[in-house]
């Protein structure tokens, strides 16, 4: 699999120069941070959960799939998180992902740039605000967990949680509409600077019970220098549980990593909801 080359600089350089991103201090592995209450996901435990605690309730004999009836537990959510082995390449798992925030996502959408005015602008504002606060699928109704990985100046945030089937279906339908509603719009940042945002649909592997992918491009300035943030956003429904992947950075997006995270993550979640312990992912890439 061909992967684009990346700058050798590390994420902390981008943070130090203040070009894009802010990260608040956060303790513990992949946890839901006290310092960043906007994040919905629960803290990831380094210990391996027992098989019996991965999901609650048993599927009925007539149920077509275990994922349709099982509820995700806290231990199950942690077990469903992907690992470095799942996405491979040069990704490194980090312990502060719950506090990640992208400054370029903060701003007020320009209502005047929409033909149908306030209605469309509200959807686009919701998109930016929910991406910033890690709540694109809403607040989990049950158990949840998250983890994150870095590679150069790119970051991949992976969330899994029980959101409820109906809520997830509405979220996926809403995401599907954004490529038309929010195809291009302008945002005014807190510094008064103008940013251009483009949203397009992106393809995902045919996994889960429903899925939707978007690619978001934000162009603006930081410290007087032009800067571009490009993000893949991918959501998958498995029963009443959902997966959300946000991947990218100022150097662009590795779409292959997004697709791999979606594919491997869906498989892990399905195994957990079936009452199984996800098996380690074998290395298959050069």
Located regions from the model:
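Solvent-exposed, polar/charged alpha-helical surfaces in well-ordered, non-transmembrane soluble domains
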Residues: 75, 79, 85, 169, ...
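Surface-exposed amphipathic alpha-helical segments
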Residues: 247-286
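A short, solvent-exposed beta-edge/loop patch
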Residues: 58-60, 197-263
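Soluble non-cytosolic domains of exported or imported proteins
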Residues: 71-72, 81, 118, 169, ...
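A small/polar (G/S/T-enriched), proline-flanked helix-loop surface module common
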Residues: 98-221, 225, 285
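N-terminal low-complexity, Pro/Thr-rich disordered segments
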Residues: 24-79, 273-286
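Sec-dependent bacterial lipoprotein signal peptides
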Residues: 1-24
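Sec/Tat-exported extracytoplasmic proteins
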Residues: 84-91, 95, 167, 179-186, ...
């Amino acid at each position: 699999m061909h992967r684009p080359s990346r700058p050798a600089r590390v994420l902390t350089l981008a943070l130090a120069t203040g070009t894009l991103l802010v990260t608040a201090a956060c303790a513990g592995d992949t946890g839901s941070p006290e310092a960043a209450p906007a994040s919905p996901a629960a803290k990831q435990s380094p210990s391996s959960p027992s098989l019996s605690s991965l999901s609650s309730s048993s599927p009925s004999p007539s149920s077509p799939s275990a994922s349709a009836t099982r509820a995700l537990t806290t231990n199950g959510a942690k077990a469903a998180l992907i690992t470095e082995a799942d996405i491979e390449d040069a990704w490194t798992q980090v312990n502060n992902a719950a506090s990640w925030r992208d400054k370029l996502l903060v701003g007020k959408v320009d209502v005047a740039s929409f033909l149908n005015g306030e209605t469309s602008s509200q959807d686009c504002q919701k998109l930016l605000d929910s991406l910033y606060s890690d709540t694109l699928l809403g607040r989990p109704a049950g158990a949840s967990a998250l983890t994150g990985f870095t590679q150069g100046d790119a970051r991949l945030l992976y969330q899994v949680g029980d959101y409820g089937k109906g809520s997830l279906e509405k979220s996926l339908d809403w995401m599907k509409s954004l490529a038309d509603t929010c195809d291009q719009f302008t945002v005014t940042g807190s510094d008064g600077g103008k940013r251009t945002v483009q949203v397009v649909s992106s393809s995902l592997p045919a996994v889960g019970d429903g899925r939707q992918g978007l690619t978001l491009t934000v162009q603006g300035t930081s410290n007087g220098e032009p800067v571009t943030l490009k993000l893949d956003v991918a959501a998958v429904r498995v029963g009443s549980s959902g997966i959300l992947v946000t991947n990218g950075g100022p150097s662009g997006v590795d779409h292959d990593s997004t697709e791999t995270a979606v594919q491997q993550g869906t498989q892990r979640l399905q195994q957990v909801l079936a009452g199984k312990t996800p098996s380690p992912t074998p290395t298959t890439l050069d």
